[in-house]
């Protein structure tokens, strides 16, 4: 039990930090407009990115991994139950190199050189991949052991089931590390069972039929719940051929109404 008197000092400090906040706290994703909304991925927090299948959730998470690896501020752990470590690495190689990932695409000499250079450039980057098919108690114990050996700064978990959210939130608190989980939903603004355990809820929306110049598809990242920052919409561009996400240059495209989370 905690008395009001004991909690007032901490609550006051949080309020002062919120009012005077300028830079994102915690780990930044490399997407400035998105980071301004969520205010960074904080240790112990659970963030969920939800969308219908095949809209780019995994690609978005891998772009975050790429940005972290290039800046080298933290060591990420990537978990996925639906793809093998080789398949995930193939996608990362596509994102890093910018070489089209289509299987019917013939590599040019320049693209072959880029792939070779990319392999050499990222070979020693600190990234661990877990492709276990089952997220059970044994899996969580292994994650705790891995964290003790490697001190991961961020855990990204793909293909998560809603029933795993309470345990993931508990794990984030135990390890004092942010967890970024990806969930598939059947509808555009689908309800996420177990979302009461989640600190930040994000939906990714993309119209597969809509593309702009140079094959860029507009994407909306909608922050619908945020215990640490703002709610609102961030605009990004997605390039399906290379699986890359990029900020929309014009900041006016990110000026959807934002409101402080209360």
Language model: regions and residue ranges:
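The Walker A/P-loop phosphate-binding site
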Residues: 2-99, 194-195, 261-262
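C-terminal regions of RecA-like/P-loop NTPase motor modules
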Residues: 5-7, 137-152, 170-175, 189-262
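Cytosolic-facing regulatory segments adjacent to core modules
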Residues: 36, 72-151, 234
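Hydrophobic/aromatic beta-strand patches that form the interior of the parallel beta-sheet core
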Residues: 47-49, 77-79, 130, 180, ...
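A short beta-strand-to-loop transition that corresponds to the Sensor-1 phosphate-sensing loop
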Residues: 80-83, 181-187, 207, 227
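Conserved P-loop NTPase "ATPase switch" module shared by AAA+ and STAND
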Residues: 149-162
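Structural recognition of the conserved hydrophobic beta-strand(s) that form the central parallel beta-sheet
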Residues: 156-158, 178-184
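Conserved Walker B catalytic segment
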Residues: 162-170
